[in-house]
């Protein structure tokens, strides 16, 4: 009898141990499948797929070709920086060709017009013939103005595409932020970035492009006909554009910093109070409910981090060619300005100085907007961490 009872208890112990092991082994599988299903559900509801599909192909294709995906946060953190550096090298080599070719063409024209100075008899100081200098200045301006005008159009189109990324991505991230409990931060960032995106679009289309083209036209005329004395008007236009840029960036930075600090504090207090209430006043399962809320917030944070990091990389990919192109054109203008000074061709020297000012202003405007967009995404990502 005792032997039968011991056998019975032994089978019961084996069954209980097997049940316990299956529970422990099955829990990670269930947890992983639940996290994946929850992630896919929130990916569809948040509009993240539509946002990724709306990104410009020139910003997304270099990332997808390197195996980067917004759903794979590990690859973004491990390979994102390497992909940016590789693309930067390719973009630099690709954008170097046209400025170098135009530099050689304009330098050839300048040297051809400066030959009379080099061949003049010793002891005599003859000026370059007026007609030859005028013709050389006109040819050099035409060779340099055409690609610079096209560059202005391309940069402004890039800024408009970057505005689309900002206006399309921030609402998605703010919606995820609001769903994870950060209601104040979600609503605040959405309003501020929407206003900034609309202002940047208005400045680009209605102010930046016309002012830069007018500046180039007036500076060209003033250098061809120095007696018109239009340099003061050119300097005033450029100064107005730069002060507008400084004011817009300073105002946006101040508003974003203030709203970020206030909303983070308000959301932190609200979330901690809610967790404390659930843990204290819900009997037995209050702590489990609070832990479940933390898990959901962490999953939402992972979703937000993947989308935001991919958007930042797309912005950098989009703006890098413009950065390199503007920098190379500025360098080309500086070299040509120095060559004009050596050949004593003052008309062309003033023109290339004006072109350099325009390109530097364009580069500053592009860098400022890229900084605004990247900072906006970074602040949304850092709000509440991954699951505060």
Model-based region annotation:
Residues 1-17, 23-133, 147-161, 166, ...:
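Gly/Ser-rich, low-complexity
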Residues 102, 106, 110, 114, ...:
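Hydrophobic alpha-helical transmembrane segments in multi-pass membrane proteins
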Residues 165, 226-230, 341-349:
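Juxtamembrane helix-boundary/capping and inter-helix hinge elements in multi-pass membrane proteins
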Residues 190-254:
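Loop-centered beta-sheet repeat module
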Residues 237, 343-363:
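Interfacial loop-to-transmembrane junctions
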Residues 305-346:
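Helical hairpin unit composed of two closely spaced alpha helices linked by a short loop
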């Amino acid at each position: 009898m005792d032997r039968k009872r011991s056998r019975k208890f032994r089978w019961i112990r084996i069954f209980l141990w097997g049940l316990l092991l299956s529970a422990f082994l099955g829990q990670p599988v269930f947890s992983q499948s639940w996290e994946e299903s929850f992630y896919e559900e929130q990916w569809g509801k948040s509009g993240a797929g539509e946002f990724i599909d709306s990104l410009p192909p020139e910003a997304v294709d270099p990332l997808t070709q390197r195996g980067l995906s917004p759903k794979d946060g590990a690859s973004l953190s491990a390979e994102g920086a390497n992909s940016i550096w590789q693309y930067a090298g390719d973009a630099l080599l690709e954008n170097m060709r046209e400025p170098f070719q135009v530099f050689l063409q304009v330098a050839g024209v300048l040297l051809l017009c400066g030959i009379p100075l080099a061949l003049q008899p010793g002891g005599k100081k003859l000026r370059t013939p007026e007609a030859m200098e005028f013709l050389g200045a006109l040819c050099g301006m035409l060779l340099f103005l055409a690609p610079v005008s096209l560059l202005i159009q391309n940069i402004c189109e890039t800024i408009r595409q970057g505005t689309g990324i900002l206006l399309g991505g921030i609402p998605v991230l703010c919606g995820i932020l609001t769903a994870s409990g950060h209601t104040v931060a979600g609503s605040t960032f959405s309003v501020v970035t929407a206003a900034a995106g609309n202002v940047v679009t208005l400045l680009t289309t209605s102010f930046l492009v016309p002012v830069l083209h007018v500046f180039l036209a007036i500076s060209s005329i003033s250098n061809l006909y120095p007696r018109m004395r239009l340099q003061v008007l050119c300097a005033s236009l450029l100064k107005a554009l730069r002060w507008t840029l400084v004011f817009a960036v300073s105002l946006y930075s101040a508003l974003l910093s203030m709203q970020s600090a206030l909303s983070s504090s308000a959301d932190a207090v609200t979330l901690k109070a809610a967790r404390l209430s659930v843990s204290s006043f819900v009997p037995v399962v209050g702590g489990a409910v609070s832990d479940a809320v933390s898990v959901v917030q962490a999953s939402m944070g992972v979703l937000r981090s993947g989308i935001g990091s991919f958007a930042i990389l797309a912005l950098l990919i989009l703006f890098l060619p413009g950065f390199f192109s503007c920098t190379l054109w500025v360098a080309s203008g500086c070299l040509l300005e120095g060559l004009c000074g050596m050949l004593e061709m003052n008309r062309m020297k003033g023109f290339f100085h004006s072109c350099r000012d325009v390109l530097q202003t364009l580069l500053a405007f592009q860098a400022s907007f890229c900084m605004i967009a990247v900072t906006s995404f970074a602040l949304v990502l850092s709000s509440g961490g991954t699951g505060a």
